[in-house]
């Protein structure tokens, strides 16, 4: 299978549309379809912070329902799911923008979005193993010895990265650079931590180029191993592009 794997969108629907068109997709009935049968894949964090989270969610739901996309959840997806479950989550760190959009919708739309997003999340794999094990898509990455496993430890790593429990002065978590130690044969494609350019290291690539923070929205074309990006229309926030610890 041939894939176009898209980094963290975070509600940047305009850039998502531009990127899919640049990749050769044609929008039909509100979803991007590739004339050559390429399939989209998403590293998670569809919503929060950006201006059009519901449109991004709607599009991905439609694509997955039509078996035209692969979706794995990110930590923001996990939090939105818990919000929809009625759990006591803090409506902060970007979730407030998605909740505000959702609350402005009519009751029928609210029910549909909530129900369909919860189904999307519940049916999604924690991480995706594709192309006979040659490709792994995991939101914040995955250790080689975790591939094929599924437990709370693996879930925490896949959603949040290799966090130490410590915090930076701005409140963001300290993360170890797990990719430095990866020695596996599978290509791991991930996002979560914004980088200015796609970051290749030891058969891994981080394609979260910080669209919602004014960077770019990036896709990896697989198996071609080419990255394609479009510039963000959001204000640039330099401090969000932090090197790994």
UniProtKB/Swiss-Prot annotation:
Keywords: Hydrolase, Nickel. Its EC number is 3.6.1.17. The keyword Phosphoprotein does not apply. Gene3D superfamilies: 3.60.21.10. InterPro entries: Ap4A_hydrolase, Bis(5'-nucleosyl)-tetraP_PrpE, Calcineurin-like_PHP_ApaH, Metallo-depent_PP-like, MPP_PrpE-like, Ser/Thr-sp_prot-phosphatase. The keyword Hydrolase applies. Its cofactor is Ni(2+). It catalyses: P(1),P(4)-bis(5'-guanosyl) tetraphosphate + H2O = GMP + GTP + 2 H(+). GO terms for molecular function: bis(5'-nucleosyl)-tetraphosphatase (asymmetrical) activity; nickel cation binding; phosphatase activity. One of its GO terms (cellular component) is cytoplasm. Belongs to the PrpE family. Asymmetrically hydrolyzes Ap4p to yield AMP and ATP. NCBIfam families: PRK13625.1. This is Bis(5'-nucleosyl)-tetraphosphatase PrpE [asymmetrical]. It comes from Anoxybacillus flavithermus (strain DSM 21510 / WK1).
């Amino acid at each position: 299978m041939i894939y176009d794997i898209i980094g963290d969108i975070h509600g940047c629907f305009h850039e998502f549309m531009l990127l899919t068109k640049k990749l050769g997709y044609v929008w039909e009935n509100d979803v991007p379809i590739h004339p050559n049968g390429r399939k989209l894949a998403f590293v998670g964090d569809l919503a929060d912070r950006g201006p059009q989270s519901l449109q991004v969610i709607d599009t991905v739901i439609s694509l997955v329902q039509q078996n035209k996309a692969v979706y794995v959840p990110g930590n923001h997806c996990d939090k939105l799911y818990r919000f929809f479950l009625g759990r006591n989550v803090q409506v902060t760190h970007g979730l407030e923008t998605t909740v505000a959009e959702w609350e402005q919708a009519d009751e029928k739309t609210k029910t549909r979005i909530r129900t369909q997003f919860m189904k999307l999340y519940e049916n999604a794999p924690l991480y995706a193993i594709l192309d006979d094990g040659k490709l792994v898509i995991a939101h914040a990455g995955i250790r080689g010895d975790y591939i094929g496993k599924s437990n709370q430890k693996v879930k925490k790593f896949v959603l949040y990265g290799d966090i130490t429990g410590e915090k930076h002065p701005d409140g963001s978590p300290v993360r170890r650079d797990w990719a430095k130690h990866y020695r596996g044969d599978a290509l791991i494609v991930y996002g979560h931590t914004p980088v200015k350019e796609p970051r290749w290291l030891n058969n891994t690539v981080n394609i979260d180029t910080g669209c919602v923070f004014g960077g770019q929205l990036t896709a990896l074309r697989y198996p071609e191993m080419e990255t394609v990006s479009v510039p963000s229309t959001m204000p640039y926030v330099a401090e969000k592009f932090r090197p790994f610890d």
